[in-house]
């Protein structure tokens, strides 16, 4: 998408420039109106007691977010800097800064600082076609986030960043995100059984990162999430990846319209049924291309086997041997002979030496989602073959 910048006329008369200055002043109310015109398609609107304009800075006073259904959520003062009106009547905002959060509920206090969105494009007409009709942002950032209960910090996040980059040829987007230094204190668990499990598994203090990376190609509607990883110290790394096609701009518009109609219907039961039917229709456009789930162990497997074994009066090794013996018996009931041996071999390899376990699906050609749903309901044992499922360990 091309982010048009406001054209600045090169005029030679200083007096004329002075007179023209007011003509090019930003219209704060028009900006808010167009933000809401685009945002209502995504779930709500923003209200403000006042809109102040100072050069290219627009301040939304005492702002609140009102979902299409539900109570308004107070936000406070939102500062929009580097605001420019595009030639087509849309807007570009260099940065939107939100007030810090400090709220207490049920004895727990949540604080969050440094909340910003960057490179925001507000469409002139959200009902139009193409990227110019979408509300987009280039980056989202938060500083430290903390949850404190009874004087102790039970959760914290060092910070987060999400980036959305339009390709030069406007064929699609690349995106990535990182939620760094996520920490959770589980020592305050009140349930005795939960506390015992936490202690045995050495999960009293969890520390790790969540990262993601992917791309969206607009014409075929291909969303390729190559990384959605949960990486925790002394636990392991779980990575989810998937690729689907058919998620095109018209699909997005249809999805938004279906959601809007459901929100507008006062009969919620009827609205849910109508939305469900709409979703079934839209699902016809989506196809599954590939998926992978991979776990790289960082010592949690041995502790889990030891704990599970202790609950059954056996050692961790005995529990592992028991699982290896049970796996082929359980798989035999599923009637998937082409996968049974591979799964059993992978489980045996992993339990003997826990390093990694991978489940992947890569059909020879994209499979329409309705076909997958039909197979799941009518002949679930055919799914591994339809999707090209493979299981491996320590590779």
How would you label these PLM feature ranges?
Residues 15, 20-23:
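N-terminal signal peptide c-region/cleavage motif recognized by signal peptidases
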Residues 2-11:
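Bacterial N-terminal signal peptides that target proteins for export
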Residues 26-395:
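Glycine-rich, small/hydroxylated-residue low-complexity segments
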Residues 1, 24-26:
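Absolute protein N-terminus
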């Amino acid at each position: 998408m091309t982010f048009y910048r406001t054209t600045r006329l090169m005029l030679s008369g200083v007096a004329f420039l002075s007179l023209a200055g007011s003509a090019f002043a930003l219209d704060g109310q028009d900006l808010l109106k167009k933000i809401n015109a685009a945002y209502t398609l995504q779930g709500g609107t923003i209200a403000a007691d006042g809109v102040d304009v100072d050069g290219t800075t627009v301040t939304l006073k005492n702002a609140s977010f009102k979902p299409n259904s539900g109570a308004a959520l107070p936000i406070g003062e939102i500062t929009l800097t580097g605001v420019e009106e595009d030639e087509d009547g849309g807007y570009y905002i260099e940065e939107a800064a939100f007030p810090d959060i400090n709220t207490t509920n049920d004895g727990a206090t949540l604080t969050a600082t440094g909340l910003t969105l960057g490179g925001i494009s507000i469409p002139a007409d959200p009902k139009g076609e193409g990227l110019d009709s979408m509300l987009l942002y280039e980056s989202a950032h938060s500083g430290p986030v903390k949850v404190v209960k009874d004087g102790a910090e039970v959760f914290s996040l060092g910070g987060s960043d999400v980036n959305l980059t339009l390709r030069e040829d406007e064929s699609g987007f690349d995106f990535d995100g990182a939620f760094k230094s996520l920490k959770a204190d589980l020592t305050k668990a009140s349930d005795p059984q939960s506390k015992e499990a936490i202690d045995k598994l050495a999960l009293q203090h969890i520390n790790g990162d969540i990262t993601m990376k992917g791309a969206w190609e607009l014409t075929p509607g291909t969303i390729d999430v190559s990384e959605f990883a949960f990486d925790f110290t002394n636990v392991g790394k779980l990575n989810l990846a998937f690729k689907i096609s058919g998620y095109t701009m018209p699909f997005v518009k249809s999805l938004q319209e279906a959601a809007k109609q459901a929100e507008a219907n006062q009969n919620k039961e009827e609205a849910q049924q109508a939305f469900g039917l709409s979703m079934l229709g839209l699902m016809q456009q989506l196809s599954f291309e590939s998926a992978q789930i991979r776990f790289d162990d960082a010592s949690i497997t041995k502790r889990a086997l030891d704990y599970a074994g202790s609950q059954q009066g056996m050692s961790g090794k005995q529990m592992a041997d028991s699982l290896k013996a049970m796996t082929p018996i359980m798989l035999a009931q599923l009637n998937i002979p082409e996968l049974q041996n591979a799964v059993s071999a992978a489980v045996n390899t992993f339990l003997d030496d826990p390093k990694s376990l991978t489940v992947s699906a890569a059909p020879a050609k994209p499979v329409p989602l309705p076909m997958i749903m039909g197979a799941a309901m009518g002949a679930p044992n055919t799914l591994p073959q339809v999707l090209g499922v493979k299981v491996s360990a320590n590779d």
